[in-house]
């Protein structure tokens, strides 16, 4: 080899060695899911032995208290407990368990424990110019970690946003990122065309209306045409949902859409991988269940009244030095969020739900009673989630029965709701939010109100309670009013105003009744902590649903 050839070869090798490594092509959809438990589930057996009652579940055998249902027991290491027909899973969530005689007469009982799954999924859609964002269906955690692009340097990966940077690494087709709850190994979604990241496929098939299934859950079904709703208009609306581009963190995420009229379910559609058997977190829409439960308890004879004093009821005696304004506080003030506590969910300096949670407060109702007042009860409305919780605890105190048992007895059984979960505080249902129901059961709440408190011929809640609960008693904001833990609003319809009331929760949870049209609409969604969550009730109902109703 000649000397010039050698020099040329050396230069080529040097240039090759100094050239940057080729960046991997990350274009496409990436995703990962972490499951956090709970691990106890399956068949529960409770049986009598010569030494007393025992319970078997998931490999554990423990002693049982009680000689007949209701039984009670605890698993070791806080893995769960059972009391009065409810399974209490770690983290404080209760779900009903039906015990049936298991062939051994009264000495053997069988049930099934189905805890609420705790899992988080993150999607990372990456464009050719390396723009991206984090999509999290369960909690919308991307709103707290706002990123807009991805950078790769060798094995180092950075997700970069205006304020946040997430550092991870890439190797062998895996993007590893530390995100909420743990470390996620995101892989390319192999069949992104059918991924739950999209409403229903990418691109979606042309939507054709199909009536809901008739199930043994108390819902009669019919077609849109049967109840005077335009099928073409609703088909066009559902197609709009299916065609939504998922190119932004703020894109609307609708998980379900249901419509009923004249007491019959006529539309039932699910998106983003959700289905009719999957309970959905209702967030603050649970508050309306709390008001409904209190009304049902009054209807059943529990001696609780709107003018029942809060402090006398909860403490037994009123301290001599108690603020006179607190002495005058009643159940009605809690139900209308006019108690006057220094508690506002929009004020991080107040004693609101997030502050109490972050401080690790265990005695929520006791802590709330000690919060100072900033106004006289009945004077101003402050959106405070611990006030409905305190109202629920008043109910339990007066009834001498837990809200868990009251809800199961007074509402769940007569309304045929079997698959639900109630978040707990103070060892009882948390009236401020976090309950989970299937969409069909969630919708029953508004239908019960439209029925003036009747379900399947039985008066569960008085007509007077329905009227007061759904009345526009206070202005919550410029476009919504508030009753007894129920929102209300007005819509234009055929040249006139009609009134609607609804249970509403963060993320886009809506169970709405429009009594003048004998119409009920329900949405569930995943736009937590994002203003687009109001799109269902503020845009879709007046623009697409009401014009379809004849």
Residue spans of the language-model regions?
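Bacterial N-terminal signal peptides
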Residues: 7-16
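N-terminal leader/targeting segments and the immediately adjacent pre-domain N-terminus
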Residues: 22-32, 41-45, 94-275, 302-304, ...
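Active-site SXXK
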Residues: 263, 281-307, 334, 391-395, ...
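Active-site-proximal alpha-helical segments within enzyme catalytic domains
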Residues: 291, 387-394, 433-455, 509-526
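Active-site-adjacent helix/loop patches that line small-molecule binding or acyl-intermediate pockets
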Residues: 309-315, 321-415, 439-453
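Mid-domain, small-residue-enriched loop/turn segments at the edges of structured enzyme/sensor domains
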Residues: 410-441
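Active-site Gly/Thr loop motif
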Residues: 419, 467-522
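Structured C-terminal helix/loop/strand segments within mature extracytoplasmic catalytic/sensor domains
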Residues: 503-550
């Amino acid at each position: 080899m000649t000397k010039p050839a050698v020099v040329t070869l050396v230069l080529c090798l040097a240039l090759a060695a100094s050239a940057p490594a080729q960046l991997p092509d990350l274009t496409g959809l990436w995703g990962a899911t972490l499951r956090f438990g709970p691990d106890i589930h399956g068949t529960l057996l409770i049986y009598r032995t010569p030494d007393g009652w025992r319970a078997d579940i998931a490999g554990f055998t423990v002693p049982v208290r009680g000689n007949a249902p209701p039984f009670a027991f605890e698993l070791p290491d806080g893995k769960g407990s059972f009391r009065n027909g409810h399974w209490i899973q770690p983290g404080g969530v209760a779900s009903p368990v039906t015990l049936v005689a298991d062939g051994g007469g009264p000495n053997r009982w069988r049930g099934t424990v189905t805890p609420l799954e705790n899992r988080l999924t993150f999607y990372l859609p990456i464009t050719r110019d390396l723009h991206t964002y984090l999509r999290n269906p369960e909690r919308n955690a991307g709103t707290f970690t706002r990123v807009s692009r991805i950078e790769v340097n060798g094995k180092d990966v950075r997700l970069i946003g205006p304020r946040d940077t997430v550092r991870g690494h890439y190797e062998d087709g895996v993007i590893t990122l530390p995100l909420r709850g743990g470390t996620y190994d995101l892989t390319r979604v192999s069949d992104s065309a059918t991924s739950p990241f999209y409403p229903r496929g990418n691109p979606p098939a042309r939507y054709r209306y199909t009536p809901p299934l008739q199930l043994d859950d108390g819902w009669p079904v019919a077609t849109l045409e049967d109840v005077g709703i335009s099928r073409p208009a609703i088909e066009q609306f559902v197609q709009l949902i299916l065609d939504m581009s998922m190119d932004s963190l703020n894109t609307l995420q609708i998980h379900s859409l249901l419509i009923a009229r004249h007491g019959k379910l006529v539309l039932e559609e699910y998106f983003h991988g959700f289905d009719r058997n999957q309970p959905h977190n209702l967030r603050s829409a649970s508050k309306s269940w709390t008001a409904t439960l209190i009304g049902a308890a009054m209807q059943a004879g529990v001696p609780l009244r709107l003018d029942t004093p809060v402090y006398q009821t909860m403490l037994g005696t009123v301290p001599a030095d108690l603020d006179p304004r607190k002495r005058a506080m009643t159940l009605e003030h809690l139900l209308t969020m006019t108690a006057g506590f220094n508690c506002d969910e929009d004020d991080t300096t107040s004693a609101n739900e997030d502050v109490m949670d972050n401080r690790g407060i265990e005695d929520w109702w006791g802590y709330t009673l000690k919060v100072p007042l900033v106004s006289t009860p009945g004077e101003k409305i402050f959106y405070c989630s611990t006030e409905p919780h305190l109202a629920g605890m008043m109910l339990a105190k007066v009834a001498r029965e837990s809200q868990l048992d009251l809800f199961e007895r007074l509402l769940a059984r007569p309304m045929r709701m079997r698959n639900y979960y109630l978040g707990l505080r103070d060892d009882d249902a948390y009236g401020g939010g976090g309950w989970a129901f299937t969409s069909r059961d969630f919708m029953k709440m508004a239908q019960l109100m439209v029925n003036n408190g009747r379900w399947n011929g039985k008066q569960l809640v008085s007509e007077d309670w329905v009227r007061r609960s759904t009345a526009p008693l206070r202005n919550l904001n410029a476009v919504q009013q508030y009753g007894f833990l129920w929102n209300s609003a007005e819509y234009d319809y055929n040249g006139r105003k009609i009134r609607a009331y609804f249970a509403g929760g963060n993320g886009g949870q809506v169970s709405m009744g429009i009594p003048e049209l004998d119409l009920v609409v329900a949405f569930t969604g995943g736009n937590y902590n994002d203003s687009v969550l109001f799109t269902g009730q503020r845009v879709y109902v007046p623009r697409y649903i009401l014009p379809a109703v004849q």
